[in-house]
Amino acid sequence: MENFKGLQKSLYIWTDSADLDKRVQQLKSATGGDVALENVHRLSFSSYANSSFDLIVIECAQLTDSYVKLLHMLKPSGKLHLVSFIGPAASLLQEIKLSGFINCREDSPDALTAEKPGYETGSSARLSFAKKNASAVNVWKISGDDEELIDEEELLDEEDKQKPDPAGLRVCSTTGKRKACKNCSCGLAEELETEKQSQKANETAKSSCGNCYLGDAFRCSTCPYLGMPAFKPGEKVQLGDNLLKSDI
């Protein structure tokens, strides 16, 4: 009872009326406050308001359906003290915890104490994690001072830096494109034709399938070069007279 000093309002729930006055006086002396009385069998019919008592003392622990009610009757951080309980203390402590009490402990072989949390049952509190910290650094934002810029000159190789031949940039005075018009009189048509003929002369000779010079392993079944050794691309190969005659 020494831990209950200073509690102003207490409720004593009794089962045996013998020496009841003596026990009540002991509780008053320990707390220094007022003590109300209630019979354990009348507890379910009582209509105490929520948060009415700082301390509730019970002589009997056979209240499996009343611990939640006692929790509501206590003020925040109020205490529940059980004496002369029946059954194992561990089982009773677990039952009290499941009813919402905290700091449940066994004071002695025949006494238990528990506390109501320091807030009212059903109360709520605003959570602070939704608040934005104005000074917080947005790590996803990239600072311009930390950017590594690519040197534009490194994107160009030596060929890109060479100036084009002005002769190859000549365009038709009529169309504005490097394509001669129908009645070209500026000389672009002749120039393009010369380039075309020069390109044809430099092209590598190719067969229809492009594999004749590689050898029989790459030639088609009707190739006239079947049976002949491989030759270099563009090399002149003379076919026999028998290959130039029709089989029919």
From Swiss-Prot:
Residues 4-129 are annotated as: N-terminal SAM-like domain. Its cofactor is [2Fe-2S] cluster; [4Fe-4S] cluster. Residues 172-186 are annotated as: Fe-S binding site A. InterPro entries: Anamorsin, Anamorsin_N_metazoan, CIAPIN1, SAM-dependent_MTases_sf. One of its GO terms (molecular function) is 2 iron, 2 sulfur cluster binding. A motif (Cx2C motif 1) lies at residues 209-212. Residues 209-223 are annotated as: Fe-S binding site B. Monomer. Belongs to the anamorsin family. This is Anamorsin homolog. The gene is CIAPIN1.
